[in-house]
């Protein structure tokens, strides 16, 4: 485990240095650069835990290589998204949004599957959700204290949901999917609120997508 933690720390420090080397970087507060390191660092930790938990045999090497490429692209993406007017800003924001949800799923699955106490599992989910939400909220130019507060609010919501799942036994992958759906709903709604473009049609779209995905998970539970 210490090798995984050391690698996570090295990736976080490397991403921080990479971001600060950008010509457009302006260092205002320590948290401004720390947020950029969340996704690459958590990608390392989440991939390591998920591969150890869910992947077997020679598939582990392939998954590890794919995870390494993803982490490298995420770190490069953090550099490219320092400047919102940059040519590669849009494509990398999309890539990192997808990567964020994949990392969230890996953590949610592992945390649910492991035999952790409910308070610890809920706190773990809350912490991971808060950090990843702060990464997603960078698209709205929400940084500093505002980013932290909104991230904590989303994290607490997901932590409470993880605690509630204690009363509804699920397979780890299905529970991870449900938590991911909740994370998608929470971050999506907050994103539109911050952009001030949340209307009835958008809210209905999120409700339909969330309900459909949740129904699919429940159906999968019934089948298995």
What are these regions (language model features)?
Residues 202-223:
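Final/C-terminal transmembrane alpha-helix of multipass membrane proteins
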Residues 37-101:
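Hydrophobic alpha-helical segments and helix pairs
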Residues 165-177, 194-202, 224:
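Extracellular/periplasmic helix-loop-helix junctions in multi-pass membrane proteins
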């Amino acid at each position: 485990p210490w090798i995984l933690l050391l690698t996570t720390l090295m990736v976080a420090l490397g991403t921080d240095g990479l971001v600060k080397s950008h010509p457009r970087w302006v260092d205002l507060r320590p948290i401004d650069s720390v947020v950029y390191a969340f996704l690459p660092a958590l990608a390392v930790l989440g991939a390591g835990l998920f591969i150890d938990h869910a992947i077997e045999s020679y598939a582990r090497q392939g998954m590890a290589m794919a995870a390494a490429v993803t982490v490298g692209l995420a770190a490069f993406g953090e550099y490219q998204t320092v400047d919102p007017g940059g040519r590669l800003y849009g494509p990398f924001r999309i890539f990192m949004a997808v990567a964020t949800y994949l990392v969230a799923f890996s953590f949610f699955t592992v945390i649910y599957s492991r035999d952790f106490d409910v308070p610890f599992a809920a706190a773990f989910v809350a912490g991971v959700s808060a950090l990843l939400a702060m990464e997603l909220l960078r698209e709205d130019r929400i940084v500093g204290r505002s980013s932290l507060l909104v991230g904590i609010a989303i994290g607490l919501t997901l932590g409470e949901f993880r605690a509630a799942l204690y009363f509804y036994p699920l397979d780890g992958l299905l529970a991870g999917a449900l938590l991911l759906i909740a994370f998608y709903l929470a971050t999506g709604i907050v994103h539109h609120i911050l952009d001030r473009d949340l209307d009835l049609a958008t809210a209905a779209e999120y409700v339909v997508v969330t309900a459909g995905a949740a129904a699919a998970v429940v159906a999968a539970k019934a089948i298995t």
